[in-house]
Amino acid sequence: MIKELIQTSYLFGSNAPYVEDLYEQYLEDPASIDEKWRQFFDRLQQTPASDGRVETPDVPHAPIIEAFAQRAMQPRGVSCPVSEGDLEIARKQVAVQSIIGAYRFLGARWANLDPLHRRERPKIPELEPSFYGLSDADMDTVFSAANTYFGADKMTLRDLIAALRQTYCGDLGIEFMYISDPVIKRWWQQKLEPNRSVPSYDNAAKKRILQRLTAAEGLERYLHTKYVGQKRFSLEGGESFIVSIDEVVEAGAEQGIEEMVIGMAHRGRLNVLVNTLGKSPSELFAEFEGKYKSKDLPAGDVKYHNGFSSDVVTAAGPIHLALAFNPSHLEIVDPVVVGSVRARQDRRDDPKGRRVMGVMVHGDAAFAGQGVVMETLNLADTRGYGTGGTMHIVINNQIGFTTSDPR
C-alpha cells in the first residue's frame, strides 16, 4: 500500500494545476508531452465510467471555455425596459423588507424591559425608516407584507412599523433570529406576530394568574412583617416567576413529563417551596423561629438551602417535583440538576428526555457572572451528559446582588 502511495505521490492536490495543464497539452498534441505522462493519460482515457460505460475520447477544453466566456460577454437578445418609477418602488420595497428583518433581529434591544426607567433605551438607527432612505412621505404608502404574520398581505408603512414595534419592542424582548433552523424561526414568527406578542387570556386564566400572584406577594409580605431583618432573599420584583413556573409544570405534564428537577439559588426559593412544591407554611415559619429541626440537614445550615420534593396534581395528572438542595455558591447546583435529570432518565429508560426534564432558575447577575453556568451549558447534547434539553429561567429583579454600593 505504501508503495502504491509513493508511486502516485505526484498526484497530490498542490500539483493539480500542473497536471491539468499537462492534460490540456496532451489533448491538443499527445506527442508534445513526456512519454510517461502520455501513457498515464492514455490509461485515463480508457478507464470506464462509474456506470461501466466507455466514454468517447476527451477533447481540448480551452476552446470550449473560451466559447462560453465570449458568449457571456455578448448582450442578451431580450431586454426588459424598466422605468425610473418602477425602480424606485422596488428599492423602497427592499427597504421595507430590511426594516422587517431589523426588528426581528434587533427589536429586543429596544424592548421596554426596565419598569423602573433607570436608564434610557439605546437608540438603534437600524429600526428607523430613515436609515433605509424612507421618509415621512412614505409612511402612508402601501407595501407588501406577505412575509409577515400580521394578517394582511399589504400594509401601509405606518401600520407595519407600529405592528413591528408592538411585537418586538413592547414588554417582551424576543431574541430568536440567531437560530440556524429556518423552521424554528418561522415557528416563533407565527407565534408572536399574529397577536403582536400580547397574550390573550380568558377570565378563568386571568383569575388563576391573579390568585398565584396574590399568593406569592402575600407570602413575601407576611415574612417581611413577621420576621423583620431575617434573611429570606425575597422574590419581590420577580413575583411573576411563580406564575411562570406553574405554567412550565402544567405544560410539562401535558407533554408527558412525569418528573421535573428544579435547581435555583436563594432569590425566591422560599416562595417556590411553599407556592409551587406545596411545602407546609407552618414548617417554613418554624424554621424562621428556630423550632424546626430537619434530620436531613447538618446543624448550622440555613432554610434557603433546603431542598424538597413532592407530587403535584396538574390538569393533565400528577407530576413529581424535586427542588435540589443548593449551598451558598449560587449556581453550583446547575450540573447537579443536569446529573440528577440524566440519572432519572436512565432509570426510566428515557433516552430522548420525554419523561424527565430539568428547570434551572438563575439570577440575572449570577447567570452572566458565574462560569459554572456556561460550563454546564457546554455539556448539552453530549453522549454522556445530554438530557434532551433544559428550561432556563433568568429572574431579573434589577437588584443583581444585595451588597451596598461602595461608592
What would you call each of these model-derived segments?
Residues 44-241, 257, 294:
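Extended, charge-enriched "interface" segments that sit outside catalytic cores
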Residues 222-282:
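Active-site pocket-lining segments that scaffold enzyme catalytic pockets across diverse folds
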Residues 21, 25, 29, 40-43, ...:
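Generic, well-ordered alpha-helical scaffold segments in large soluble proteins
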Residues 9-12, 27, 85-89, 150-154, ...:
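Hydrophobic alpha-helical scaffolding
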Residues 1-44:
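Subset of Sec-pathway N-terminal targeting signals
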Residues 17, 94, 239-243, 331, ...:
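Conserved active-site and cofactor/substrate-binding residues in soluble primary-metabolism enzymes
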Residues 2, 214-225, 246-247, 300-318:
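Active-site-adjacent bridging/hinge elements
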